[in-house]
Amino acid sequence: MARKSVIQREKKRQKLEQKYHLIRRSSKKEISKVPSLSDKWKIHGKLESLPRNSAPIRLHRRCFSTGRPRANYRDFGLSGHILREMVHACLLPGATRSSW
């Protein structure tokens, strides 16, 4: 299980990303529309002034129950071994074990 501080840090990043999402998106659209290089640099400086953790690339998908950052399934929001345990315990409706 991931440390609580790591999970809280990830939640803080998600809040920052949501807060600055529209500003970041509008600035990127402006850069593509503006023809002059000096104006592009000004807009780029505005983008750089935003908090670093507000960038969506810094987010990690984490397991809902354990906080594990690797081997996550998007559909369930769980890591692989927790997903397997829950399927074996019949806790996920519609998920079946493969057998051949």
Curated annotation (Swiss-Prot):
GO terms for biological process: translation. Pfam families: Ribosomal_S14 (PF00253). The keyword RNA-binding applies. Its main location: plastid. GO terms for molecular function: rRNA binding; structural constituent of ribosome. InterPro entries: Ribosomal_uS14, Ribosomal_uS14_bac/plastid, Ribosomal_uS14_CS. Part of the 30S ribosomal subunit. Binds 16S rRNA, required for the assembly of 30S particles. Belongs to the universal ribosomal protein uS14 family. This is Small ribosomal subunit protein uS14c. It comes from Glycine max (Soybean).
